[in-house]
């Protein structure tokens, strides 16, 4: 079974660190609008990986993304130690958190079973 991963704001160097296997398809969105359009056309995505620095209002924009995804889609936010985010409220929304820098081990732990 093929797993689809959609990224927003994640550069190629970081994607290479994730060690994404051959059974996965990687889709990259350059803007939040492009990500929204991919989801609006009904593209089934298993995991969405978003960089917190790519969002102007992370909580609000993540809520928009949540509204466009199926219940089985995992949303992962890469955040940084100096971000001023309410991590608990993001967890309550069902957002998984992955602190930068990205590592293959951290990614694998979050995406097991996807």
Predicted regions and their residues:
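Conserved acidic segment of CheY-like receiver
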Residues: 2-12, 19, 48
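Conserved beta-strand segments of the P-loop GTPase G domain that flank and frequently precede/overlap
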Residues: 7-8, 48-52, 76-79
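Short, structured coil segments at secondary-structure junctions
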Residues: 21-22, 71, 91-94
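Acidic, metal-coordinating helix/loop segments flanking the phosphotransfer/catalytic sites
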Residues: 29-47, 55
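Output/docking surface of receiver
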Residues: 30, 76-114
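Conserved phosphotransfer microenvironments
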Residues: 45-69, 83-86
